[in-house]
């Protein structure tokens, strides 16, 4: 599976980039709003599955939208806000 970067280059999909970005957003929130490692892994896996189901290269923006949707689905509004910014 490929990702289309903002500069138009196609690169291999890397789930660890999602995990890292969501972890950073979660860590910046702190307290009870922080996500568990398991929740972060589940979000990354769900986004990966959604991207694979599209059967095409997806843009970075599409991946970010999917991550945001997953965060909102689990009511992680504070983490979503930090992820977006």
Residue ranges and their predicted role:
Residues 1-85:
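Long, C-terminal-biased catalytic regions of enzyme "large/alpha" subunits
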